[in-house]
Structure formats: structure tokens, C-alpha cells
């Protein structure tokens, strides 16, 4: 739902139920010209022969957790711009235990399982998975490989810059998902 940035911050700060996540902010990045800074400073992480760059800025209240999901992009980076976050990562071989849901309308690949508080009906399967737990602070960047499952838990006043890249060969490789 498109809303003003100041209103989004108010909603997040007053979010006592930890349910609001602000993401998919490409329009905001373009209107504020932050996108120029992202493009100028991503030379070290942008791959050669890139066909698509997707930048995003994520903010949420303390304790908010993103759904467990994976990306098909050739490269996925997250940069903590404020505060601290925690991540749970699982390798692609874990997919058979995660009841993956493929949403081709939004091009999202998620799991109904909450890796931070596993629901009882998924406990037996989730116990077969080994998750990598990572804590990150302001200024740290992390590369998340394609098809790796991840979920982010936001700390106090945390914000994240996200950089996602597709190359021409990556587009060919994921064409069965696109067509």
C-alpha cells in the first residue's frame, strides 16, 4: 500500500504487534534520488553482464520477522544501514522440508514455516534442517546465494539496503520460472 515515508515511520514506531514491514520501495528511492547513490556505490558488488538491478530499502519495528523465502537472482546482498539484525539461513537442499509456496504473480518463493518460532505441525520436518544464524550490525553487508532460504529479524531502529542483480545467463537459467 503506497503511503508517505513519514506516515510509514509513525506506523512502524507505534507497531506494538510487530507486524509491519516496509519494503519494495523502488519508487521512494527514485523520488528521493537515493537510487543514484546506490548505483554509484555498488561497483564492487555488481556483477558483469548485468541485465537487471533491483534496489530496495527495508525498515521495520524491533522484533519484526520476514517470511522464510529465497531469491532467484544471481546475486543478493543486504547492507545494514542502521541498528542491528539477525538472520536465519538454510541451504537449498532444505527445500523439501520447507513446504515451499511459489507465487509467480509477485515472483516470491516462501515457506509457511516461521524459522524463529516453529509451528508444531512443521516441527518434525524443520528439525531435519540446519540453519545458519547470523547477527549483523550497522555497516555490515552479506551475500545471500540464489536459492538459499533466509529470514530477517529486525532489531531496534534497524534499516536495510537490499541489492539484487540478475545477469543475462541468470535470466536464461531461471527462464522456466519466468515463462
Regions found by a protein language model. Give the residues of each.
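N-terminal accessory scaffold of Fe(II)-dependent oxygenases
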Residues: 1-141, 149-179
Amino acid at each position: 500500500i503506497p503511503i508517505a515515508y513519514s506516515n510509514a515511520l509513525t506506523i512502524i514506531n507505534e507497531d506494538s504487534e510487530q507486524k509491519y514491514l516496509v519494503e519494495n520501495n523502488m519508487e521512494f528511492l527514485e523520488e528521493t534520488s537515493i537510487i543514484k547513490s546506490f548505483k554509484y556505490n555498488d561497483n564492487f558488488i555488481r556483477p558483469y553482464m548485468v541485465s537487471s538491478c533491483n534496489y530496495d530499502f527495508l525498515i521495520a519495528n524491533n522484533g519484526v520477522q520476514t517470511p522464510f523465502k529465497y531469491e532467484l537472482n544471481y546475486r543478493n546482498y543486504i547492507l545494514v544501514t542502521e541498528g542491528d539484525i539477525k538472520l536465519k539461513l538454510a541451504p537449498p537442499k532444505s527445500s523439501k522440508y520447507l513446504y515451499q509456496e511459489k507465487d509467480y504473480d509477485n515472483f516470491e518463493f516462501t515457506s509457511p514455516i516461521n524459522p524463529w518460532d516453529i509451528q508444531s505441525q512443521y516441527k518434525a520436518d524443520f528439525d531435519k534442517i540446519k540453519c545458519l544464524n547470523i547477527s549483523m550490525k550497522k555497516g555490515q553487508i552479506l551475500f545471500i546465494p540464489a536459492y538459499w532460504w533466509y529470514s530477517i529479524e529486525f532489531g531496534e531502529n534497524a534499516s536495510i539496503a537490499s541489492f539484487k542483480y540478475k545477469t543475462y545467463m541468470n535470466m536464461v537459467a531461471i527462464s522456466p520460472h519466468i515463462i
